[in-house]
């Protein structure tokens, strides 16, 4: 019997993985110092240092505002050195925003993954233009799992200055971790967190989950499973007439081109998924706890509605 509550609209639908839940339960025993001066935050910080093979790491939580976003042209969801130059060199007058930081998403919003050499090429371009490189790693774990690369190889060793390491989509309840690979960029960061209302008094309950996720490589195990389920779905629907894969499956998302009647029929059958990627486009996301049987049920329904 499969869990009928499992859906494919978002990897945020899933709950908390057992490793994270266990760490939070342990952190709930006794008293600890507040505002990040606790043993769990120290352990999490040290775990990040080990994982990324560096001593320059940050702490959980980040918030910023007031920035002007300039959207770059992409290829399969990925920014290129050429598209960065197009924006950075477009205008130099005071009436145009002055670019300061390039942000790339790993894995991207369409499920593609930047290779180390692609990140390095972007980093080299950023240095040439006097820009910093920030990586939005909401699904960073999935990228590592797909490529078989270490976190260091996909971040600072490839030229990333700051990484936002996501945990929410990989078994945590809340929380992202900010890792600074250039110590100078982290100066006064604690003050900015405080000013932005991001300094939790009981920080251990944001830090302990990271200990549970990082120790014994639970983060990698869960992201591998989510990726596997996405690959399985892709394989199961690959021979269905009329179904087209919109983007290569490299992380935990599958983007399919379906007929509009099929999209409506799937929705009528109770399946939840997003259709923001164009007419007939559908996104199906797999999670750390997605059941293979549920993937097969979805694939079977896609086959039925496409043949109707």
Locate each region found by the language model:
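Conserved PLP-enzyme active-site core in the AAT-like
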Residues: 2-269, 275-290, 298-306
């Amino acid at each position: 019997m499969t869990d009928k509550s499992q859906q494919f609209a978002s990897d945020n639908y899933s709950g908390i993985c057992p490793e994270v839940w266990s760490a939070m339960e342990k952190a709930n025993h006794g008293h600890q110092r507040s505002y990040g001066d606790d043993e769990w935050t120290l352990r999490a910080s040290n775990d990040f240092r080990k994982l990324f093979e560096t001593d320059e790491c940050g702490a959980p939580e980040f918030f910023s505002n007031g920035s002007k976003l300039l959207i770059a042209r992409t290829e399969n969801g990925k920014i290129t050195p050429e598209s960065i130059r197009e924006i950075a060199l477009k205008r130099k007058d005071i009436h145009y925003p002055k670019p300061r930081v390039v942000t790339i998403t790993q894995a991207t919003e369409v499920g593609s993954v930047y290779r180390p050499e692609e990140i390095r090429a972007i980093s080299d371009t950023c240095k040439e233009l006097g820009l910093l490189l920030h990586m939005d790693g909401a699904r960073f774990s999935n990228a590592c799992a797909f490529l078989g690369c270490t976190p260091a190889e996909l971040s600072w060793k490839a030229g990333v200055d700051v990484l936002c390491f996501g945990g929410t989509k990989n078994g945590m309840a809340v929380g992202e971790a900010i890792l600074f690979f250039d110590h100078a960029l982290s100066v006064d960061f604690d003050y900015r967190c405080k000013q932005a209302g991001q300094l939790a008094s009981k920080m251990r309950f944001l830090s302990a989950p990271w200990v549970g996720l990082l120790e014994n490589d639970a983060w990698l195990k869960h992201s591998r499973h989510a990726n596997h389920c996405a690959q399985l779905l892709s394989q199961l629907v690959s021979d269905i007439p009329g179904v087209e894969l919109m983007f290569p499956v490299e992380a935990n998302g599958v983007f399919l081109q379906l007929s509009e009647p099929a999209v409506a029929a799937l929705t009528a059958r109770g399946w939840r998924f997003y259709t923001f990627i164009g007419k007939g486009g559908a996104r199906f996301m797999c999670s750390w706890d997605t059941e293979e049987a549920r993937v097969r049920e979805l694939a079977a329904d896609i086959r039925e509605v496409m043949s109707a």
